[in-house]
Amino acid sequence: MAIDNGKLQEEEASSVTRFYNIILGWDYKQLTKENERKNRKDSKEKLNVVKNTYKDVDDYFETFEPLLFEEVKAQILQNKDGEEASVCKMRLVMECNEGEGFHFLLVTYEHEEDEYLAQNDLLLLSKEEVKGNSFPSSYGFAVVEHRQNNLLRLRMYLAEDIVQITKNTKSSRTKSFIQALSNMRSLITSSASPIDKRVFSLKLCGLSTIIREYIALRSVSSLPFKDLIFTAAEKSCGFGDEAWKISGPLNEFFNENLNKSQKEAIDVGLSRKSFVLIQGPPGTGKTQTILSILGAIMHATPARVQSKGTDHEVKRGIQMTIQEKYNHWGRASPWILGVNPRDAIMPEDGDDGFFPTSGNELKPEVVNASRKYRLRVLVCAPSNSALDEIVLRLLSSGLRDENAQTYTPKIVRIGLKAHHSVASVSLDHLVAQKRGSAIDKPKQGTTGTDIDSIRTAILEEAAIVFATLSFSGSALLAKSNRGFDVVIIDEAAQAVEPATLIPLATRCKQVFLVGDPKQLPATVISTVAQDSGYGTSMFERLQKAGYPVKMLKTQYRMHPEIRSFPSKQFYEGALEDGSDIEAQTTRDWHKYRCFGPFCFFDIHEGKESQHPGATGSRVNLDEVEFVLLIYHRLVTMYPELKSSSQLAIISPYNYQVKTFKDRFKEMFGTEAEKVVDINTVDGFQGREKDVAIFSCVRANENGQIGFLSNSRRMNVGITRAKSSVLVVGSAATLKSDPLWKNLIESAEQRNRLFKVSKPLNNFFSEENLETMKLTEDMEIPDAPLYEDESLPVAPYGGDDDFGDGDADQDDVAMAGED
């Protein structure tokens, strides 16, 4: 069915207009007052709670649109008083025009100071500089449209009419704000000279991602599988007739190299179901499964091909030598070699565009007759890091073709902040390569139009495109003449539903949602939206509604003693250990009970304290000191652990993480980042280390543990380690929560619960270590459960050279710490 691009663009423009009519009409002063109120029951009563299923598009939209705008409000106010608060900049209004109900301004732009400004950034424009909690006489929101002749083009909505979000919304403007808008309108439209039309701008936040989410939300009614999204039920489409199959060699390879649950996930995908949900618990080979799915769907063919009333098996091509394959790849991927695509012999429509499946690049007509066109796949993830992990794995291991031979397909990674390890396939790099080859040729220029043409050619020829969820809604992909047949979303449980909708608008026919609702959810800034279920991912919602989910069950990361608790607590005991995983994860330091594989250290005399600033984050200095003792003892006895690639320190609280980093910088200077990896729980999802030390922080008499009670945060925190996870916390405080009580009791049952008294360094004395040493013929010694005797003090020191330095890592921003 043909896609009416004109209609799509018209609908998108309508969505953008409505979005800015609402956002730009808000009163910043009123928003700050609402935010200061501790209890916002009045707002929550107007919001629909996210449900598992919906009657129709109106029911769906009336739920999500108000929640999305609540999130916008929270993002606007997020940095108001924080460390990242912006500074007011004075600008001159050079020109002002009206159109479509908006005012469009051209204001002065300072190149060096304004580099931080980007399209869709939201600004507060005012007559006077905004200082503290005082508000100027004239103010209003403005959004950055683009740069024009060394000027910034801004959009404002200064009409007195307010655009309501829903029919139940009863918003109104105060008289003071109406006057402020009137004053601003008079200022920017006056005939005075620019020097007399000074305004101040304050950057509040970027809106690019959330406006893409809004456009996707508004276009949900045009999706071919909208009914499935609403009802979580897929209509019977006779999948048996439409199912695809893979070649014998490729199927044999998967049978030999994948476990049962991974192979079943591929089979579900080949059934051609519109939505395929794959749950990947920690260490179950989720990324490998995604690569296998890519290999399968790139080379799948209809199970039977009808030809003149007779069923025929699909023809298979002959094998090529590796040199012949590389020769063909060079022609099929011209930008890699700097060749002009128009000068190259391009693969015929129907070829996969890489190593020819026909077995003969000179006879493309021998390509499988059942493949009418080359499949295109869009692979997305919520974050750059999650996306680049897949790209890197694909580059390092490749895919398998129908002959089960390894090859590297034509791929392109679009968007910002690509990791340096995948830069070779980034769009910018490929364009630069192509431009370089063009410059060397006579009569060839590199105008803006030429660059756009190069980008388009690269995207059109790539079989797999990688983009974050947000960037999949960029104009770059929207300009493409072709959509995508398949969309694969990794870490799908970490995305709010509107974000998941963005890549689905690319005309795809099949969607794979891969993730784990038992691990970290999406970050939602607004507590009002969070309480209404806005953080629920589409994956989780469909799963709750009963949509079938294929779970990967064999884990290849954790020692069985680490796997035991999360499997029972979060996955109903379904996780199995890969072959020889115990032998692969057993280490020399396991001869001591206190070094794993699974331990809980009860710092029963520790106390938490709160960050003096407005962040609300917490720190526990006793836990900091004890973790340093663990680290020192481990790396002194086992020097191979003195590496950030081997050992991690994890904590849910930013303040605790910062304190750890400061202490390690004091000890190791510029080498700090090399000797240990320190980050928040949120910053460690999807990663693994040999040893992980988890600092819980919370220790108080009231048994309050804040967001530490989040089961997903616990699951991620304790499943990062391959050989040893060492949990440090206050047993008395944590036992107030049923989940943590279960974990502590699990440690106790395994004789791996240690009570640590002050002075803390007594615990790792030579004498005490001997009591915790396992003999060769026993796994759990007959040793006291709690170690609280007064023992000689072990010297805290060593051969390390301590120095000064300022190396640090960026903290992962978290919302709602408490």
Swiss-Prot record:
GO terms for cellular component: nucleus. ATP binds at residues 280-287. Disruption phenotype: Defective in female gametophyte development and micropylar pollen tube guidance leading to zygotic lethality. Reduced size of nucleoli of polar nuclei in female gametophyte. Keywords: ATP-binding, Helicase, Hydrolase, Nucleotide-binding, Nucleus. Its EC number is 3.6.4.-. Residues 781-790, 798-818 have a biased composition (Acidic residues). Expressed in flowers, siliques, leaves, roots and shoot apex. Residues 259-559 form the UvrD-like helicase ATP-binding domain. It holds the Pfam family AAA_11. Residues 781-818 are annotated as: Disordered. Its main location: nucleus. It is found in: Nucleus. GO terms for molecular function: ATP binding; helicase activity; hydrolase activity. Probable helicase that may regulate RNA molecules involved in nucleolar organization and pollen tube guidance. This is Probable helicase MAGATAMA 3. It comes from Arabidopsis thaliana. The gene is MAA3.
